[in-house]
Design a protein with these regions (language model features):
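A structural signal for multi-pass alpha-helical bundles of membrane permease subunits
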Residues: 1-184
Length: 184
C-alpha cells in the first residue's frame, strides 16, 4: 500500500518497487546452486527453511499484483477516511484491505499453487527423506525399468485434493477477480 501510494512522490518507494519487481526476472535455475550453498550454511535445508524461502520468492509477484490492484482504487477513499479521522493503519485495514479481497484471494491461490506444485526447490534443498514433499514422493514411484502405477495414481489424487479444496472455498473471489479484470 505504501509503495503504491507514495511511488510518484518519493524516489525511495519507486526504487523499492523496481527492486521487488526486478527479482521476477531472475529464474530459479540461475540462483539454484548459490541458494543450495547458502541454505546449507544457514541451516535452511529443512521444511521451515524452505517455507521461509517460498515467502521470500513469492514477494515480487505478490507485490506486483497488490500494487496493480491498489492503483485501481481511487485515492478519494483515502482522503475520505482521513477526513473521518482515520490514521494510515486504519485507512489500510478498514478501507483499502476489504476492497482487496479478490486480489488477496488471487494472491493466496497463486502462492498456494506455486508452492504446492513446486518440484525444483524441494528437490535441491531437502535431502532428508522424512521431510520430502508429496511431489518428491511421486518421483520415487518411477524406477529405472518400471513404474508402480497404483501407488503413483493414488499419490496424484493426494496431491490434487488440497488444490481442489482451496479452489472450492475461494471460487467466489476467483470469479469476482476474473470478471473485474475482464470488464473495463
Amino acid at each position: 500500500y505504501a509503495i503504491t501510494r507514495n511511488r510518484k512522490k518519493s524516489k525511495f518507494f519507486s526504487l523499492m518497487y523496481y527492486y521487488f519487481i526486478s527479482a521476477m526476472f531472475i529464474p530459479f535455475q540461475v540462483i539454484m546452486l548459490p541458494l543450495v550453498v547458502q541454505a546449507n550454511a544457514f541451516h535452511l535445508d529443512n521444511i521451515y527453511g524452505i517455507t521461509f524461502l517460498y515467502i521470500i520468492f513469492g514477494l515480487p509477484m505478490n507485490t506486483f499484483l497488490y500494487t496493480g490492484a491498489i492503483k485501481a482504487i481511487p485515492e478519494a477513499l483515502d482522503e475520505a477516511a482521513v477526513i473521518d479521522g482515520a490514521n494510515p493503519i486504519q485507512i489500510f485495514s478498514r478501507v483499502i484491505f476489504p476492497v482487496l479481497k479478490p486480489t488477496t484471494a488471487t494472491v493466496a491461490i497463486l502462492s498456494f499453487m506455486w508452492t504446492w506444485n513446486d518440484f525444483s526447490m524441494p528437490l535441491v534443498l531437502l535431502s532428508d527423506e522424512s521431510q520430502q514433499t508429496l511431489q518428491l514422493a511421486q518421483y520415487v514411484f518411477k524406477s529405472q525399468f518400471s513404474v508402480d502405477y497404483n501407488l503413483a495414481f493414488a499419490s496424484y489424487l493426494l496431491v490434487l485434493a488440497p488444490v481442489l479444496i482451496v479452489y472450492i472455498f475461494c471460487q467466489k473471489w476467483i470469479m469476482n477477480g476474473v470478471v473485474a479484470g475482464a470488464v473495463k
